[in-house]
Curated annotation (Swiss-Prot):
GO molecular-function terms, A-Z: catalytic activity; mRNA 3'-UTR binding
Native organism taxonomy: Eukaryota, Metazoa, Chordata, Craniata, Vertebrata
Pfam short name (any one): ANGEL2_N
Record's protein name: Protein angel homolog 2
InterPro entries, per the entry: ANGEL2_N, CCR4/nocturin_mRNA_transcr, Endo/exonu/phosph_ase_sf, Endo/exonuclease/phosphatase
Length: 544
């Protein structure tokens, strides 16, 4: 008899062909999620000899949930239960995207074995490694000469300030469980047990405890988990927590948490990007802006403005992303504006769903953007082709949004009122608002902050891109920590026209990794890292 042969098609799917025998029925041709051959034929049709030992029952059951394979009684149209049901069906070894090296030809499904001892040795190695990240200490003696030190000791020349306030900031997209389950196709490479919240949350909390940041900016914080687990756990670690849930029926939001011992809270300012009266703004993303006062017993220090957001993902809606960013910058401008007309230092964190070098990223760093002729799908840099995409309109958002092209709240001119004694007076403007004159239609956007990125996004020695997220479909940088650098640490930017009270000096950052690094531990999430994003972490000094 001529043996069945397998022809590889696509990701993890094999199609069974035949020699001189009739074709199988259509519903029995796929060996993926839809069916499994009888055990005897499965051994014949598979070129990978590990298949005979790869199927096991996870855990210890008093009675197996399904019978073992038999050519007499196994149903060819059997379908496994849902990915996140409480009881697991049989499981197979790991799947990886075709763009990366694979050692086994035959991959059946995303149901992964629990027992690492039963996996092929080439796959077992993935589950034994851990991510190695280290602190990179940075000293800016001047903007032309920046040192990055890879050891555990800070450059002594950096320790030159007597009046200083040092603090650390973490930005972390912790991956909402509901979003994980709604987008399970992004996690085909994962072993199923590592995707359960009961496994993931202890790992996430362990990371937070280990790094012990003074300020946490968290994204994709699921509301029910926040109330029952996340907030109580963080409060027990000495954090004060503020949370803004996404609008509509979205289950998650953004949180900013800070150590009681380091800061006191001056104001909380949530930002909703959904506006019923603006058709463009029909998405439920949010931001959160806090004004924090450093606790320094013997010195007077400026406040610090901390912002956190998660912008829209959709790569083809750059107009919405830019408008959401402008709304966040307008709120930051309002909150950070001091009574003396200057602005306090700013830290802006989040998942911006935009890649380094994209127009949106460049706008944040350079303070200006001319978007005339820019395709809507090119704004975030996630789309490689702009064919069939419309051009950004001028202006991007309508006047009734109340935000100028300088990304500040517009203040309407109030008509002068005549007092009974004949004097003409005008109500005094709120000092936290910025007066903006009427502007002609322009394709130029600006903001008034000198913002730098904590990370350079490429390895200094090789130029290989760093990544902050890595799953079955993508590995790229979308998460950032931006900060208002002291004047000596950043070149003057065209949009930066405001005076700052002090400035932030970047002392150190936790190193990032490459896509290749992450796939050595089977991508994200994995046994030790329970989000599909890496936490970003930076240490700053506020000069007093």
């Amino acid at each position: 008899m001529e043996a069945w042969r397998c022809v590889r098609r696509g990701y993890g799917r094999c199609v069974v062909g035949r020699g001189r025998y009739p074709m199988l029925p259509h519903h029995q041709k796929s060996l993926g999620r839809d069916w499994t051959t009888p055990w005897e034929n499965l051994q014949k049709c598979c070129w990978n000899r590990h298949i005979s030992s790869c199927m096991r029952w996870p855990g210890h059951y008093s009675r197996a949930p399904y019978p073992y394979f038999s050519s007499r009684h196994f149903s060819l149209n059997w379908r496994p239960p849902g990915l996140f049901e409480s009881r697991a069906p049989f499981q197979y070894w790991n799947w990886r995207p075709d763009s990366l090296s694979q050692t086994s030809l035959f991959h059946l499904s995303s149901y992964i074995m629990n027992s690492e001892g039963d996996e092929p040795s080439s796959k077992r190695r993935k589950h034994q490694g851990t991510i190695q990240r280290h602190w990179e200490y940075i000293c800016n003696h001047n903007k032309e000469n920046t040192k990055i030190l890879g050891d555990e000791n800070v450059d002594p020349i950096c320790e030159d300030s007597e009046n200083k306030f040092e603090f650390s900031v973490m930005s972390y997209n912790i991956l909402s469980q509901d979003l994980l389950e709604d987008n399970s196709h992004l996690y085909k490479h994962c072993r199923r047990p590592v995707l359960h919240w009961s496994f993931r949350f202890p790992n996430i909390l362990k990371e937070i405890k280990h790094f012990d940041a003074d300020v946490l900016c968290l994204q994709e914080v699921q509301e029910d988990h926040y109330g029952t687990e996340i907030r109580p756990s963080l409060e027990s670690l000495g954090y004060h927590c503020e949370y803004k849930m996404r609008t509509g029926r979205k289950p998650d939001g953004c949180a900013i948490c800070f150590k009681h011992s380091k800061f006191s809270l001056l104001s909380v300012n949530p930002v909703e990007f959904y506006r019923r009266d603006v058709p463009l703004l029909d998405r439920d993303n949010v931001g959160l802006v806090l004004l924090l006062q450093p606790k320094i017993p013997s010195a007077t220090s400026p406040a610090i403005c901390v912002a956190n957001t998660h912008l829209l993902y959709n790569p083809r809606r750059g107009d919405i992303k830019l408008t959401q960013l402008a709304m966040l910058l307008a709120e930051i401008s309002s909150v950070a504006h001091q009574k003396d007309g200057r602005f306090c230092p700013i830290v802006m964190c989040g998942d911006f769903n935009s890649v380094p070098g994209s127009p949106l990223y460049s706008f944040i760093k350079e303070g200006k953007l001319n978007y005339e002729g820019l395709a809507i799908g090119k704004v975030s840099g996630q789309e490689q082709s702009s064919r069939g995409q419309r051009i950004l309109s001028i202006p991007i958002w309508p006047p009734n949004l109340g935000i100028s092209q300088n990304c500040v709240y517009e203040v309407q001119q109030v008509p002068k009122v005549e007092k009974p004694d004949g004097d003409l007076t005008q109500p005094e403007l709120d000092k936290t608002e910025v007066l903006v004159t009427a502007e002609k239609l322009s394709s130029n956007l600006q903001h008034h902050f000198s913002l730098s990125s904590v990370y350079s996004h490429y390895l200094p020695d090789t130029g290989i891109p760093e990544v902050t997220t890595c799953h079955s479909r993508s590995a790229v940088t979308v998460d950032y920590i931006f900060y208002s650098a002291e004047k000596e640490g950043v070149a003057e930017q065209p949009g930066a026209e405001v005076a700052l009270v002090g400035g932030l000096k970047l002392l150190a950052r936790l190193s990032l990794l490459t896509e290749q690094d992450l796939w050595t531990v089977n991508g994200l999430p994995n046994e030790n890292n329970s989000s599909d994003h890496l936490p970003l972490l930076a240490k700053f000094r506020l000069e007093l």
